[in-house]
A protein has these predicted regions:
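Bacterial N-terminal signal peptides
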Residues: 8-18
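Internal, hydrophobic beta-strand segments that form the core of beta-sheet-rich folds
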Residues: 164-165
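Gram-negative (and chloroplast) outer-membrane scaffold detector with strong preference
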Residues: 27, 56-130, 141-144, 152-156, ...
């Protein structure tokens, strides 16, 4: 009696997994963005400015819900307080909701957590046993991320996505004029879809 029940349970599980796999989507994106931040004060500068190359991916696995990862960094170093080169990096892992809007468009909403890594460059190398040698010191901050975009499909799989992301960075205001940064940009992407 146990073998038929096990067989039926296995068949049902296989059927459920097969139908879940039917509605999967994996996306890769590359783009460029600009960053704005709170206005400078008499003693602190803004984190805004510069071009930010971006990379992202997401995996939608249940009714257009899924998880994603985004990374953005300033392409060229900026100068901190008039003398020290620095470069910000933003990383986040998100929950993603991407419902279709007809045949050639798809909305994308995301919210998640991550980190901002501020790299302050020095004129000398610092070497460590496990880290090797680097010419920068990092200041890392926890962040929350909220974003949105609109995927406009130019083919079945290729899309262009205007996007905006708001970063709420914990303790960033110790070094810059505020704890908020907003990234606006455009990405191109490719969708690997198992359904249409």
């Amino acid at each position: 009696m146990k073998k038929p029940a096990l067989f039926v349970a296995s068949f049902c599980l296989l059927f459920l997994l097969g139908s879940a796999a039917h509605a999967q989507q994996f996306d890769l994106t590359f783009g460029v963005s600009g960053l704005t931040g709170d206005a400078s004060t008499a003693t602190l500068q803004t984190i805004g400015g510069g071009a930010y190359p971006t990379f992202g991916m997401d995996f939608l696995f249940y009714h257009h819900l899924g998880v994603g990862f985004n990374a953005a960094f300033r392409a060229k170093q900026n100068i901190f307080q008039g003398f020290q080169p620095f470069r910000p990096f933003f990383y986040d892992v998100d929950a993603v909701y991407a419902p279709p809007l007809g045949k050639h468009a798809q909305a994308e909403l995301s919210a998640g957590i991550g980190a901002e890594s501020l790299r302050f460059y020095t004129p000398f190398l610092t070497c460590g046993t496990f880290t090797g040698c680097t010419n920068f010191v990092s200041s890392n901050h926890f962040l929350g991320q909220f974003g949105g975009g609109l995927r406009l499909y130019v083919t079945r799989s290729f899309f262009i996505r205007p996007e905006a992301h708001v970063y709420l960075v914990h303790n960033q205001d110790a070094q810059f004029s505020g704890s908020r940064a907003t990234r606006f940009g455009v990405s191109i992407g490719y969708s690997f879809k198992s359904y249409e």
